[in-house]
A protein has these predicted regions:
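Feature for intrinsically disordered/low-complexity regulatory segments and propeptides
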Residues: 1-11
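Intrinsically disordered, low-complexity regions enriched in serine/threonine
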Residues: 28, 43-255
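A short acidic/basic microdomain associated with nuclease active sites
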Residues: 17-44
Length: 255
C-alpha cells in the first residue's frame, strides 16, 4: 500500500515534539493529496552570516528538512536535509544530506520518528558545517570565465555567449541563472560576484515553490518531481564541482 501522508507528518510531529523544536512549516500537496512535500525550517538552530568580504548585508541561514512522499511515481518517501537561506528562501542541499532517510512503500514506516530522532542531532551538526562552508564561499570572488565553467557543469544547463540568443531550454536556463547572479550581487550588497552569489542563483532554480514565478527570472518550479530532480542534480554539483573549486581557491589555487 502507498505510504499515507499523515503517517509521515504525524511521525515528524512526534519527532519534533520529542526534541522540543518549533519549526516553521510549509506544506505542498499534489495529486489530490496522494503526494506531498513538507518543509520544516529549524530557525532556532541557525545564525547570520556575512555575504562576502565587502558585503553590506547579512543573511540568516538555518538547517531545514524536506519531507517528500510519492515524489517520483514509485510511492517512495524521503527526508532531505538542506540549509535554508532567508534572503531568497532557497533550500541548499548537498550530496551527503540528500538522503537523510528514505523509505519504500513496501516497508514498515511506523518507526520513522525513532530512526530519524536517533540521528537528528548529528544531522544538525552536519548541516551547521555546511553553513560554515557557505560562509567561506562568500569570501571567494570569481570572474566571468569561472562563472561560465561552473554553470556549464550543472546537469541540464548550458551556457551561451550573452551576445547570442538562447535557443535550447538548457541555454535559456543558463542565461536566466546568469542574470539571477547579478541580481543576487545587488540584493546582498556585494561589490563583485562571489561563489555565494552563484550558489544562491542556482539554488533558486532547484527550490520547490508554490509560485514558480516568485523570483524575477522565474527560475523556480512548482512541480514536485521536477523540483526533487533539480535538487538532486544541484546537490551533486555543489558537492562534486563547487566544493573542490572552492577548496582549491581557498588554498591559493587559480582553477
Amino acid at each position: 500500500q502507498p505510504i499515507n501522508n499523515s503517517v509521515i507528518t504525524e511521525n515528524m510531529f512526534q519527532l519534533i515534539n520529542q526534541k522540543g523544536l518549533i519549526p516553521h512549516i510549509t506544506a505542498y500537496e499534489y495529486n489530490n493529496g496522494s503526494a506531498m512535500a513538507v518543509r520544516y525550517q529549524f530557525k532556532e538552530k541557525g545564525r547570520d552570516i556575512q555575504q562576502g568580504p565587502n558585503g553590506t548585508k547579512n543573511t540568516f541561514l538555518c538547517p531545514e528538512i524536506w519531507a517528500y512522499n510519492s515524489y517520483d511515481g514509485t510511492q517512495t518517501a524521503r527526508l532531505t536535509g538542506a540549509v535554508y537561506d532567508s534572503a531568497c528562501e532557497n533550500g541548499i542541499a548537498f550530496k551527503n544530506t540528500i538522503n537523510f532517510y528514505k523509505l519504500k512503500h513496501t516497508k514498515n514506516n511506523a518507526d520513522m520518528a525513532y530512526i530519524v530522532g536517533s540521528e537528528l542531532d548529528s544531522y544538525f551538526d552536519r548541516l551547521n558545517q555546511q553553513i560554515n562552508l557557505l560562509e567561506s564561499w562568500a569570501n571567494i570572488e570569481i570572474n566571468y570565465m569561472d562563472t561560465v565553467r561552473l554553470l556549464e557543469k550543472i546537469k541540464g544547463v548550458s551556457f551561451l555567449d550573452r551576445t547570442k540568443p538562447a535557443k535550447r531550454q538548457a541555454e535559456k536556463t543558463g542565461d536566466k541563472i546568469h542574470s539571477q547572479i547579478f541580481g543576487e550581487v545587488k540584493k546582498r550588497g556585494q561589490e563583485n560576484v562571489n561563489l555565494w552569489s552563484i550558489v544562491s542563483a542556482v539554488t533558486n532554480y532547484s527550490t520547490l515553490r508554490e509560485d514558480k514565478g516568485s523570483n524575477i527570472h522565474g527560475l523556480s518550479t512548482n512541480s514536485l518531481n521536477v523540483g526533487v530532480s533539480r535538487q538532486e542534480n544541484v546537490a551533486s554539483w555543489l558537492s562534486n564541482i563547487v566544493a573542490p573549486f572552492a577548496e582549491n581557491r581557498l588554498a591559493g589555487g587559480l582553477v
